[in-house]
Amino acid sequence: MERLIVLDTETTGIEPSEGHRIIEIGCTEIVDREITENNEYHQYVQPERNVGDSVRIHGITDKFLTGKPKFEEIVSEFMDYIKGATLVIHNAPFDLGFLNHELKLFGSDERIEDQCTIIDSLELSKQQRPGTLHNLDSLCRRFEIDASARTVHGALLDAQILAQVYLAMTGGQSTLFSSEQSSDGQNQKNQKIVRVKRDIGTIKVVEANAQELEAHQNYFSQT
């Protein structure tokens, strides 16, 4: 039995080493191969910098983020929510890189992958069907999952959609939503999973070029 948390983030750019920060975290819970509605996690975060051109990707403006809590104000609640769970993330090095960077800025030596088991759904998709497209929109078309609400990137919406995609990739689900059930267990017998190595923090996800927005858009076309 294992509890799965499907996680996504939105950020101001593609490289935390260049000062980019998280602006949104969204999580959806899966228990016993059912997506639960009553235990999601969703938080907008004040990045302490301008959003810049990345607003074209996610539609989140500086004005909207005014007054939102800083990462240091939500970190305890967030870590309590995910602690001990198995995280499902599409292109895990990107989100983990940002989350671990935020933890470091907070003054913590913790890393997400030291607290949670990681499943990279992007790598799983590549193993299942090499040579095809593996971004979220393509996977929705492959598994006939409705993504019509996805007009821009959004952490919670993308986590909700990825939860459906992941279950379809790994054998389907018993019920789409269960608002009654939320526990610490998830049965993953006979599932093929791809786990991210412990040294994932050393992986460089995307190399930024002179045209940051173009790179940002090209990167997100894969996820």
Each language-model region and where it sits:
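Acidic, Mg2+-coordinating catalytic module of metal-dependent nucleases/exonucleases
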Residues: 86-92, 98, 135-191
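Alpha-helical structural motif
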Residues: 50, 74, 95, 117, ...
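Conserved non-catalytic scaffold segment of RNase H-like nuclease domains
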Residues: 1-115, 126, 138-152
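Acidic two-metal-ion nuclease catalytic site recognized across multiple nuclease folds
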Residues: 168-223
